[in-house]
Amino acid sequence: KALILLYEGEDHFHRLYLMRKTALKIMQQLSPFNPRLIGSVSTGHIREGSDIDLHVFTDDLETLLRHLDNLGWQYDLDEVAIKQGNKVQLYTHVYFFLEYPIELSVYDTLEIRVTQRSSTDGKPIKRLKPKALIALIEAEHPELVMQHDS
């Protein structure tokens, strides 16, 4: 937190808090799909154009899309090729905007047990469940939690 404040200021830290709160709201809305927060919002390394990256898990894409439709969220779909070892796997990504840009990476249900590796650095991706995100918000943003929840 101290380094973030030193280099980027209070606005950056407040935006991180708001992005995490938005991610939590979305995760709660998507609970049937076991959402996990990944990327810059989970690590705290957000930049100006950062989006909220979530992994969701379903064996039926249409069920997810119906759920999004029922929530009234307008979205775009794309197929993204991810190289895993020596094979290429296609994954559906869903893009929408709710206060911030959101990207859902859609995986089969059983892949929730698979530790994904980052396409940028090859390291295991840390995925936060909603409870872990709540704990992170309370630990890293206690004064903002008190301010916004009172």
Mark where each language-model region is.
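Catalytic core of pol beta-like nucleotidyltransferases
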Residues: 1-48, 58-150
